[in-house]
Amino acid sequence: MRQTTIIRHKETDKKWFVVDAEGQVLGRLASVVASYLRGKNKPTFTPNVDMGDNIIVINADKVVLTAKKEDDKIYYSSSGYNGGLKAINARDLRAKKPFALVEKAVKGMIPHTKLGRKQFGNLYVYAGREHNHEAQKPEVLEVK
């Protein structure tokens, strides 16, 4: 009788990938990135172990939003105090923090737990083409 193989954190093989977000639809890009951050692309996926890869997203300022979401999509944040609710649309958020659109989309697609926060820490988003992770020799990840 076979038993399920349990993978430990030490046995995981983490790789580095770089994704070019230029011309990519935000949600489709975020779902692929979230899947790789969790490690769901690996045949030995274990939900309670951080076995995801490190992902570098470049050109995050050139990601595409479909339909009228550029003006209609609202991002909310709260200070926690009465009257402390702030709202900003996607166009203004892109102008203020170009990397935040991709970060918020990916963050919503990974678990909201301690492990999810650790996996989210393996995401590096840059607005331009330049990044400082060349020493890790990242492989190019094509998003269809």
Curated annotation (Swiss-Prot):
GO biological process: negative regulation of translation; translation
Pfam families (UniProt xref): Ribosomal_L13
Transmembrane is among the record's keywords: no
Residue ranges crossing the lipid bilayer per the database entry: none
Keywords of this entry: Ribonucleoprotein, Ribosomal protein
Any GO MF annotation of the entry: mRNA binding
Cellular component aspect of the GO annotation: cytosolic large ribosomal subunit
Record keyword Ribonucleoprotein present: yes
Family classification: Belongs to the universal ribosomal protein uL13 family.
Subunit structure: Part of the 50S ribosomal subunit.
Biological function: This protein is one of the early assembly proteins of the 50S ribosomal subunit, although it is not seen to bind rRNA by itself. It is important during the early stages of 50S assembly.
HAMAP family, sorted: Ribosomal_uL13
Name of this chain's protein: Large ribosomal subunit protein uL13
Native source species: Mycoplasma mobile (strain ATCC 43663 / 163K / NCTC 11711)
Gene: rplM
